[in-house]
UniProtKB/Swiss-Prot annotation:
Polyubiquitinated, leading to its proteasomal degradation. Residues 130-167, 248-289 are annotated as: Disordered. Interacts with btbd6a (via BTB domain). Probable transcription factor. Probable substrate-recognition component of an E3 ubiquitin-protein ligase complex which mediates the ubiquitination and subsequent proteasomal degradation of target proteins. Inhibits neurogenesis. Pathway: Protein modification; protein ubiquitination. GO terms for molecular function: DNA-binding transcription repressor activity, RNA polymerase II-specific; RNA polymerase II cis-regulatory region sequence-specific DNA binding; zinc ion binding. GO terms for biological process: negative regulation of transcription by RNA polymerase II; positive regulation of type I interferon production; protein ubiquitination; regulation of cytokine production; regulation of immune system process; regulation of neurogenesis. During early stages of primary neurogenesis, expressed in the neural epithelium, with highest levels in the forebrain and midbrain. Also expressed in a posterior-to-anterior gradient in the caudal neural plate at the 3-6 somite stage. The modification Phosphothreonine is found at T283. It is found in: Nucleus; Cytoplasm. GO terms for cellular component: cytoplasm; nucleoplasm; nucleus. This is Zinc finger and BTB domain-containing protein 16-A. Coiled coil: none annotated.
Amino acid sequence: MDLTKMGMIQLQNPNHPNALLHKANQMRLAGTLCDVVIMVDSQEFHAHRTVLACTSKMFEILFHRNSQHYTLDFLSPKTFQQILEYAYTATLQAKVEDLDDLLYAAEILEIEYLEEQCLKILETIQSSDENDTEVNMNDGGTEDDEERKGRHGRNLVGSKKHSTEESGYVSAAQQALALPGMVDQSPSVSTSFGLSTMSPTKAAVDSLMSIGQSLLQSTMHPGVGAEQPLHGNSHPMMGEIKTEMMQVDESGEHESPKAMESIASSNGERSGEPDKNRDGPGTPTRSSVITSARELHYVRDEGLGDQQAEVSQMGLEAMAGMTEKHLASLYGIPSNHKNEAMLSMPASMASSLHMSPALAMSMDFSAYGGLLPQSFIQREFFSKLGELAAGIKPDGRSLNERCNVCGAELPDNEAIEQHRKLHSGMKTYGCELCGKRFLDSLRLRMHLLSHSAGEKAIVCDQCGAQFQKEDALEAHRQIHTGSDMAIFCLLCGKRFQTQTALQQHMEVHAGVRSYICSECNRTFPSHTALKRHLRSHTAGDHPFECEFCGSCFRDESTLKGHKRIHTGEKPYECNGCGKKFSLKHQLETHYRVHTGEKPFECKLCHQRSRDYSAMIKHLRTHNGASPYQCTICLEYCPSLSAMQKHMKGHKPEDIPPDWRIEKTYLYLCYV
């Protein structure tokens, strides 16, 4: 048989994919060729960025930074270990109660197939639970408390985008309270976070605000309007919004599904929908799945006999727990209308949300352009609202402090001050890379991704700083030329507003002591040093003592910085890679690793370095050249103090009138 006449021959190894994954997992476990470290709750996981990027779209975006260390703060080490096993072996073993965390992680990391698998299992669990509930109700039997609590936990229902197609998103607050008669929502309605003022969705949001305010007032003042009928003129549907599990819990009675169907029927007639559009039996849609396997315990006030007060207390909680079937029947949505964008407000947050619901729509995430999955942004958004609602008792009484703007009650003064910044628009979170400021840490974290979105950076040819846009580079170049050149100390890099301030600062390095204490006649190099010294005469000598070594200090801030030597505390953390530092200036120097900035330049060979110490080491490579050179006799000195001593040997008439000590430096600094 002549093989040369057969043309092309295809060779295939069917075991190659499995063998490749198996070998990669062996290398990961052995730490071989691992090029990325993922930090989760102080626990390090070594892996290969190629494997993670192929598994997760989110990792593919993050790894454009070319950093070796990343920190994840939205999942536990146990969950990430399961994610790693899934990425390297295509399988994982997990308990049923772990599916909630796995689904959440898969949503954020955008691991589509894992997300699909979790959803299918949860749909099966939900379908089984609903069948069991229907059988028990039809039998008329009484359930035990434990079984009822279990079903409460299993009926916590939400929904999100579950297909690979591009689809819009609508917040839980928008969808959960879009009552019939307020808005005729159709698939064409914009479901992005950036709402136009004329959109039907915006109208639904406005209606949500008025409903929330009435709920807030009835909760804070349960006696007001107690005689008002449940189906009043303001919100006729509020009394009918009850989930199946709430009906079971009330008065120990068990209502049949027909009761809910009758409510749905009346709602459908009110909204003008024909019978064929109401939901019928069938498998749960993809936007009606269990997203939490945790138990949810409702707090009921047995003393509230009035039905209005009970609805006010549990109204938001009820809406958070409603299934799509109930929403469809209540709102007149056709059964075949699968709104992929529906999301539910977390019930654990809604139960304690006694603040103004208007705060829920004050954050606009439309500007982040897909850097993070929308479901992650919404979860973080509701998490922020949950933090603002922390410290509020179910009866509305304050544990400590109350916001005078929206009425939110928070546990301490620090929390209330942080909360008030949302109302005042105070932007206290600054980006260390570009200086832009944000209202909260969530917006800052998402902004930081824009510095590593994979675009080719434009580099400053003088200091190496990197920019994404040409106009930003042009603005930066002004510090290198003309009268706008930054005024800074070439020795320590400290910036100043005026040349006079710089000259006063240089006296510190030159050893000039022109500030005298009037109490003890001691001299100091600067006014700041003198003021610090004066505290010893007015507030005791050294009242603050270190409990580790016994050293004493004049003020508490100095003692706090000293203690970090003993405790190893590193409070300054890099938002880019998670590395921590003890001192702020160490963090500022470290950021140059991410920006590529090298502001120190050697005058001899024009090589650049990121920090002063690296430049000093480099200068010594020039045939042992010292970093300081006398401008008069060209003699080298190994240190600044040696140069100052050397200059005293020259006659005053030999020194030019414009001479300054920084002219002896053999390097330039552009920061």
